[in-house]
């Protein structure tokens, strides 16, 4: 007996430029460059592979699969490629799992031969998906409250060189930096636990030093201690921090991964700890403007999961990026977004006191300003470098010229003599 089967046409079935996405669909924006196929077919292949598809034509399609097909509803030429917007039914996504979302929309699609380049530009989750994520435990307002800093950027620094310090040496530097006015002492991305500086010894010593400085200065000080490692080790390290009275942990979120970050968001909530998100390794896929994933998409995912602050760039300094891109990321992190609290953007990379007026003019006061070499390289030492940074920030907030402020701040005066004032031009790639 012959069974009649209807052949299911593929790829172009995923393209409907007259389609209007529903309120409960997740929208993803891509830039892509076709490789030997039409733009419509390339876009359809992206939608297919990231939703229900396979490389071959099928003879049967389950009813749920039909209802779960992604739809390309926008397709326009852009530079050497095209911009596509794709609507995804929520039946494709597991609730509360960034891992599963990224495996779909940023997974196998990047390996397709039909594409020369593919870049995930942004994604827009509907509330029905977003409601399964907690977002930051503290966010900008919560951090300002426990730090006691109401109307200026927070200051942070990393002891330089970033490796090689014994626990005692690190503690001595921490005392000088905190005493000079730094709010947040930060480990660097690769500084975790070593024979010359064990995490367990460092966590005990540094919080004793912090308590001493707080008593001497009357200011709240915190330590962004790097707990990154296998997730079971991260959990133990977070518990040590909480037991010592710490308020923060730092995680290298890209190398740790979304799964580890989501798990640690639950752990840190139980322990009452804020998460400082370092983005080490992000440039492996954010830097190429024609391929990879944007920093905006990473920052959005990190905010959904619940980091309290995250590095985004400076537009000035050695790690400078494009001003418009960084401003867009920062504006998103600070915006109202359903129940998800705002996140502190962190500016870092080649910053020094002379850049403070320009940096604050560009990005405002809701910012964590991290200066490493720009503080540690002060000719009179790290305490003087810390004071110079604080004085420069105070001047910028008060609208006072740095040269004028330097008349009453010998530390700032000497710093400006060493590194000068900002000469940065903004709005272009630096």
UniProtKB/Swiss-Prot annotation:
Enzyme class: lyase
Protein name: Ribulose bisphosphate carboxylase
Name of encoding gene: rbcL
Organism encoding this protein: Pyrococcus horikoshii (strain ATCC 700860 / DSM 12428 / JCM 9974 / NBRC 100139 / OT-3)
Enzyme Commission number(s): 4.1.1.39
Site entry: Transition state stabilizer: 318
Residues bound to substrate: 162, 279, 311, 348-350, 370-373
Annotated active site: 160 (proton acceptor), 278 (proton acceptor)
Cofactor note: Binds 1 Mg(2+) ion per subunit.
């Amino acid at each position: 007996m012959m069974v009649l089967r209807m052949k299911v046409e593929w790829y172009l079935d995923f393209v409907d430029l007259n389609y209007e996405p529903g309120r409960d669909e997740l929208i993803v924006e891509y830039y892509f460059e076709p490789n030997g196929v039409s733009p419509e077919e390339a876009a359809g292949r992206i939608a297919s592979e990231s939703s229900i598809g396979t490389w071959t034509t099928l003879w049967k399609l389950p009813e749920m699969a039909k209802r779960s097909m992604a739809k390309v509803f926008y397709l326009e030429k852009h530079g050497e490629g095209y911009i596509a917007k794709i609507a995804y039914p929520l039946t494709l996504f597991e609730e509360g799992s960034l891992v599963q979302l990224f495996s779909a929309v940023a997974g196998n699609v990047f390996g397709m031969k039909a594409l020369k380049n593919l870049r995930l530009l942004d994604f827009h989750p509907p509330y029905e998906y977003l409601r399964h994520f907690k977002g930051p435990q503290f966010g900008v307002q919560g951090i300002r409250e426990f730090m006691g800093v109401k109307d200026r950027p927070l200051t942070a620094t990393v002891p330089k060189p970033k490796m090689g310090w014994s626990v005692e040496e690190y503690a001595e530097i921490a005392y000088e930096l905190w005493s000079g006015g730094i709010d947040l002492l930060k480990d660097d991305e690769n500084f975790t636990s070593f024979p010359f500086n064990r995490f367990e010894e460092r966590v005990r010593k540094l919080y004793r030093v912090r308590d001493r400085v707080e008593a001497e200065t009357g200011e709240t000080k915190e330590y962004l201690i790097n707990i990154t490692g296998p997730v079971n080790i991260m959990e133990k390290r977070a518990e040590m921090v909480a037991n010592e009275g710490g308020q923060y942990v730092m995680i290298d979120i890209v190398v740790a991964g979304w799964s580890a970050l989501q798990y640690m968001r639950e752990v840190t909530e139980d322990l009452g700890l804020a998460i400082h998100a370092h983005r080490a390794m992000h440039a492996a896929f954010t830097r190429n403007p024609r391929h990879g994933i944007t920093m905006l998409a990473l920052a959005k995912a990190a905010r959904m999961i619940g980091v309290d602050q995250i590095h985004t760039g400076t537009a000035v300094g050695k790690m400078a990026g494009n001003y418009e891109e960084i401003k867009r990321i920062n504006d998103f992190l600070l915006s109202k977004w359903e129940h998800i609290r705002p996140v502190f953007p962190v500016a870092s990379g080649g910053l020094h006191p002379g850049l403070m007026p320009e940096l604050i003019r560009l990005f405002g006061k809701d910012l964590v300003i991290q200066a490493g070499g720009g503080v540690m390289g002060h000719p009179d030492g790290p305490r003087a470098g810390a004071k110079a940074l604080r004085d420069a920030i105070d001047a910028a907030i008060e609208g006072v010229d740095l040269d004028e402020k330097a008349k009453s701040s010998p530390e700032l005066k000497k710093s400006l003599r060493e590194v000068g004032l900002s000469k940065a031009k903004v709005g272009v790639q630096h």
